[in-house]
């Protein structure tokens, strides 16, 4: 699942930036904002970082732009800088930064902090895009009860089968192979390619090499046009294991 980062322009936050001291004239500020807007329209990441940094240096109390800068650093996997600017944005009242910070902690594998900030954000707004990552954080902590609760919520609206695949993995970790097969098949029904490999591996463990091979080959064929090289590697390794077992 693609990571979800919120970039919401809040007029109130812009006001905060305008009020802070700056040597910029009004015209210079408007020109800078126009350049930033155009860079976002072109998705020009190289220009965005220096432009938004310049804006934040001029207007350090603008919560919206602090959050934007955090997102830009997050996209560069510079989590320490992302964390710094998200915290500053939060201090100045940007609620979206709370959710973004939670995801940074997930990326840093600090799952307890991720859950803490996701829960803090959920008190403000019920953002369903966060459900999967809350479940994933609990799963990483092996708190399967809470993980299942959140993943089950996601199954009601998401379309890529990621949560069903995770429920399959949890069931398998709990030793419930029947339940795992059920969830992997549900994930496959939604087109999730990782579920093909996970179910194939489960069948290998059961000694059902025919079904394992069918799933791995079908999954590999479907993954031909995918950019996910890790997935393709998994299918190749699974097929190698099947051949070695026979």
Spans of features found by a protein language model:
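Canonical tetratricopeptide repeat
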Residues: 67-68, 100, 133, 166, ...
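Register position in tetratricopeptide repeats
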Residues: 41, 75, 107-108, 140, ...
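N-terminal leader/linker segments that initiate helical-solenoid repeat arrays
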Residues: 17-64
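Short helix-capping/linker turns of helical repeat alpha-solenoids
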Residues: 61, 93-94, 125-126, 158-159, ...
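Terminal, low-structured helical/coil segments at or just beyond the last alpha-helical repeat
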Residues: 205, 211-246
């Amino acid at each position: 699942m693609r990571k979800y980062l919120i970039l919401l322009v809040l007029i109130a936050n812009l006001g905060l930036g305008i009020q802070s001291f700056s040597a910029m004239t009004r015209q210079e500020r408007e020109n800078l904002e126009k350049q930033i807007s155009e860079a976002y329209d072109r998705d020009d990441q190289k220009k965005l970082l220096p432009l938004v940094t310049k804006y934040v240096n001029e207007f350090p109390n603008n919560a919206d732009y602090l959050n934007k800068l955090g997102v830009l650093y997050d996209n560069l996997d510079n989590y320490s800088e992302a964390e710094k600017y998200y915290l500053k944005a939060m201090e100045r009242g940007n609620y979206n930064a709370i959710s973004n910070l939670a995801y940074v902690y997930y990326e840093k594998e600090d799952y307890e902090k991720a859950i803490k900030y996701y829960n803090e954000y959920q008190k403000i707004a019920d953002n369903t895009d966060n459900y999967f990552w809350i479940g994933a954080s609990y799963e990483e902590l092996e708190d399967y009860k809470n993980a299942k609760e959140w993943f089950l919520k996601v199954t009601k609206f998401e379309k890529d089968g990621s949560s069903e695949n995770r429920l399959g993995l949890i069931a398998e970790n709990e030793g419930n192979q029947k339940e795992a097969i059920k969830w992997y098949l549900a994930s496959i029904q939604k087109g999730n390619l990782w579920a093909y490999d996970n179910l194939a591996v489960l069948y290998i463990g059961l000694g059902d090499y025919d079904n394992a091979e069918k799933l791995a080959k079908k999954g590999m064929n479907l993954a031909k046009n995918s950019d996910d090289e890790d997935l393709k590697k998994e299918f190749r390794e699974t097929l190698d294991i099947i051949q070695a077992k026979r």
